[in-house]
Swiss-Prot record:
Region (Disordered): 1-88, 123-174, 317-412
One Pfam family of this chain: DUF4679
Biased composition (Polar residues): 1-15, 23-39, 353-372
Segments of skewed composition (Low complexity): 50-59, 126-142, 334-350
Taxonomic source organism: Homo sapiens
Protein's UniProt name: Proline-rich protein 30
Amino acid sequence: MLPQNKDQVLPQTSVLPGRPTWGFSQLVDSSPHNLQPLSPHQGLPPSQPPFSSTQSRRPSSPPPASPSPGFQFGSCDSNSDFAPHPYSPSLPSSPTFFHQNYLSLPRPRASSPSNHWLYPSPPLTPSFSPSQPQNSSLPHSPCQSPSHPEELHSSTLTSPGPSPPSHRLHSNRQTWRWHQYRDTGSGSPGVVERCVPSEKDPAQFRDPGALAQALVVQLGHRRIAHDLRLLLLQHLWLGRTGQAPVVEYPICLVCLRPRSPSCPLPRYRTGPRLLAFPQLLPCVQGQESGPLRIGIGFGLRLPQGQARALHLLPEKRPKEAGPQGKATQACGHQLPASQPPAAQARADPVPGTPSQTRSFRSAGLQSPNSPRCFSGPPPRAPKQVTTSLKPRPCPGPKRPVSLELILQKSSV
């Protein structure tokens, strides 16, 4: 039983002798207004050869001679030798190597000069309605076969640029990375956070440990552990086993966060820093011997004036050590000349503030004895003089102290 439009179907199926017939592919590729609906009981025309199971797949065979029912074949490169003219005599008359129900997805564009796709279409069934064009199943296909078989002689399958499917996949990947970067970041890229003053004044902590703990919470334990691990691996790689790995974070005492470009300039030349370093801790607290674990210690590096302004230094120690420091300085001036400087250093009671002890030690290193013992210039090797243990008499006021004599005595 033939369709009603015999004058339209018969010229399409009549081809040159020795060439394969097109069959239903002409009906699929033709425009919808030229097609008539098929009845459910209508069978295949006698000119259409049935598909056999032995001719279903031949991956190593040459390209198909004629497109099978439900398939569209196209190429995206005009320089390709794999896409000859459909009516070219160089095409062999071999059967198709893909089954009708076999689905092959379009592959992304590679670096080869010619790329080909085999776009599957749903197989022809009795319930197929020709009111919708067959090419609508592939809206993004870059190369589609012409709608009429007469246009095959004049149509060229060329595409100067890359295929749209590969561009679409690449753009989706970039978009996903950009969204991932925006989600992982603290804010939108290129925007600097403002320095908002903290609700709690740093002077209210009155304890360096509490202030350091508040800064650690703002930084995050995971970030500090990651940075410390990288620094430790760097020291091991470079062979710096003698140096302890210490990570320093410049902080802002206005917002109690890591320093940013929007934070005000520090008052002192060396700004406040948070230190993080590894330390060995016992697994069980209070147990001296046993397995150890690696912990993270924290510290603050502040100028002395800023630490006093924030009341982070105890105030009782300078008051108690003030008169004692003055008394020790007075006793040091009244010591006899025969007393060595080592004994003078031992006679020093409990030291006071760091500034007082620093000034006192520097004075003791510069002059091993009291200034009343000799009138000559002070010795040039104070370290060797302070390490000598033998008492030596104070030289006379008219006899200058020679450096050679001091070195000989210290070497003995």
